[in-house]
Amino acid sequence: MDVHSSDPSPQPSHPTREKVVVHAAYPLWRKHTLVTLARAKELQDAGNQVAVTYCNATAGTCAVNYGGSPIACMICRNRVKKTAEALGLETIPLSVDGSVDKQLPEILFSEKRAVMEGVQSGVISTFRTLPEESRRNPMIAAIKRRYFRNASRLLKSMKAVVKDRQPDRIEVFNGRHACSRFPIIAARSAGIPFTTLEVTARQFPIVCPGYMVHDRHQIQERILSHPADVDVAERYYLRNRQPRDNKYARKHRTAFVPPDASGYRKRISVFLSSQDEFESLGKEWVSPFLNYGPIVEKACLENPDMMFLIRFHPNQADMASDVLTPFKAVSTLPNAQIFYPTDTVNSYALMEWSDTVVTFGSTITIEACWAGKAAIMLGPSFYDQLEIAYTPKTLEEFGDLLRMDLKPKSPENAARFAHFQEFDHDPLQYVKHTGRTMIENGFRIRHPWLGQLARTTDDLICNAIKLWANHASRSRKSA
């Protein structure tokens, strides 16, 4: 049943030997290193000439080392080098010292902008701040400058490797943050293909030739290639509601007591999303519906004959940016009730209560479709081309849809999505699955405890900065 597992990724046979550069990004993160080096070894076994590049910084700033720790850098370098060498893989260190700035090739303005987008993506994801807040925070702004400098030098070094080695393809894990985006920028600059690697929600490897895993257009094409298996979908959506299988269902176990909706023509549930998650994905994910508070307030005011229940996403509880103040006006309206990020009311019961479900791109959209609910989805998402919800382009279209008696969309593509979630992955020879997670198969990632220690230390530093950013944001709002 593994639709994409019979022929994992384009792997040339010996007669079509290719030169492939695989960059080892995020060396402190176990699954990233596991998938990257397992993939590199498999490519080499298939007859390809493979070289593994890695960051040679001594006190660099990146997505796994925002604190710029020299110890973390030492662990990163040694982890990649020793693990790769044990696998018989050639390694190439990428220099990031000051001398790189004076070397050719130059970095184009468009390439610098792409690096900066990668920096912004990483910073937003880690510190949970929206772009405006991160610009105001001096500590985060300083981190961004160091991160940009490090990634820019990595790009120059990678371009030099590409010029020298003339590879046929570059591969890298993820490709979203600056420290994994620069290989893709180098590939595009040289006019050669790239491949990105990732891990699925069920902890299996996935290979994306020519696109990144957050490319929603390509991912939706992949989803649509799956069968609409009703039995698989039934099991998948039922399991999602079980506390033992879904961390959000586990947190949201409080019984939903519906408000008195007598006198209202329609019951609307509104499910918000974490704005920072969309902001971190780049310009392709820019939404015309980003200002949630005013949008919801307008809908409530224009439709006094409808009852609106608004559910914050639990992930919004950890955001450093202030997401609650924009909903102060909504909280005073007679036809609105708000459930905040830390509220534990059952989201599925809230969805079932509704006549129409409104989302800002969250997974409840596809859950609503499968449950036979009419759903309106505002903004881009991994489901916006699956025909599982109504997708207005403007506020006016949204208002018109709210006032219509909408019919539920066909659940066929919701079933395809379930099959995609359950079975879509690309098995790798040197990766084994325990039933819960991935482990090495036939090799060993070096320095596991040192890597975990360095990662935990950086997490503590980042959490402290995030708390400070949160405090600063709220202080400005109350001033």
Predicted ranges, named:
Residues W29-V52, I184, P288-E302:
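Histidine-anchored nucleotide/phosphate-binding helix
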Residues M1-H14, R216-R265, L395-A479:
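C-terminal amphipathic helix plus adjacent low-complexity
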